């Protein structure tokens, strides 16, 4: 019988952002079981479900870009998997996309190189973007862990701007690993000193480096 491997993308938003990685894993495995999806198990004395996840996000950080690979007995189309599993998941954790894997590819944790974060700030009409960017890129603690950052317009009002930041998740050459919680603490301190407010923040996407280009984990499938 032909078996199936699927890579899928899911959310961790609203109150679910306060769940730990292990709680998210348990909820997903329970949803797979309730959906009667015949998941494969590892061999040995203590078999585990063959489902792997991308890097855990810090508790309290919402994400629209969590990824997982799952091995299933029998043939199953990714679109059917998405529809079936979402019937067993809350909207806060629903699967947004899925693709069948036909070729051998690296694991998510071994392959993901960058994560994109969005920070929404209320500038109260102040034009401080260049100052903030200069302060961050001049910081010895964070400059080597950030791949890129830019300010973009927000659809939430003229006083709201979004800081679009891509940080490293693994060492490539001379970079450092981006530590979200440390950066958030620093960014809030910086914002308070300038009397601006950090309204919201979340993980927007994860990327894999392929031939000098940033691809999502589903792009390479």
Description of each model-found segment:
Residues 3-4, 9-11, 15, 34:
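Extended, well-folded interaction surfaces typified by the phenylalanyl-tRNA synthetase beta subunit core
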Residues 10-12, 70-76, 119-124, 165-175:
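Short beta-strand-to-loop capping motifs
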Residues 40-72:
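Short, charge-patterned binding micro-sites
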Residues 64-118:
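Ordered, amphipathic secondary-structure segments that act as subunit-interaction surfaces
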Residues 105-123, 207-221:
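Short, low-order "capping/linker" segments at domain edges
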Residues 18-22, 75, 79-80, 126, ...:
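Ordered, soluble secondary-structure elements with a strong preference for glycine-centered loop motifs
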Residues 133-221:
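Core RNA-modification/binding signature centered on pseudouridine synthases
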């Amino acid at each position: 019988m032909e078996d199936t491997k699927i890579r899928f993308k899911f959310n961790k938003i609203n109150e679910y952002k306060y769940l730990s990685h292990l709680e998210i894993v348990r909820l997903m495995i329970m949803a797979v079981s309730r959906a009667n999806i015949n998941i494969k198990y590892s061999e040995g004395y203590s078999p585990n479900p063959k489902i792997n996840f991308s890097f855990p996000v810090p508790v309290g950080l919402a994400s629209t870009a969590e990824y997982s690979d799952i091995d299933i007995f029998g043939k199953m189309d990714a679109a059917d998997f998405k529809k079936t599993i979402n019937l067993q998941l809350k909207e806060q954790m629903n699967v947004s996309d899925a693709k069948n894997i036909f070729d051998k590819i690296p694991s998510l944790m071994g392959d993901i190189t960058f994560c994109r974060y969005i920070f929404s700030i209320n500038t109260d009409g102040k034009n401080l973007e260049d100052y903030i960017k200069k302060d961050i890129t001049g910081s010895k603690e964070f400059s080597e862990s950030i791949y890129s950052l830019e300010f973009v317009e927000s659809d939430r009002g003229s006083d709201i701007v979004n800081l679009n930041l891509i940080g490293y998740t693994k060492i490539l050459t001379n970079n450092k690993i981006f530590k979200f919680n440390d950066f958030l603490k620093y960014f809030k301190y910086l914002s308070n000193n300038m009397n601006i407010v950090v309204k919201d923040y979340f993980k927007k996407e994860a990327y894999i480096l392929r031939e000098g280009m940033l691809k999502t984990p589903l792009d390479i499938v």
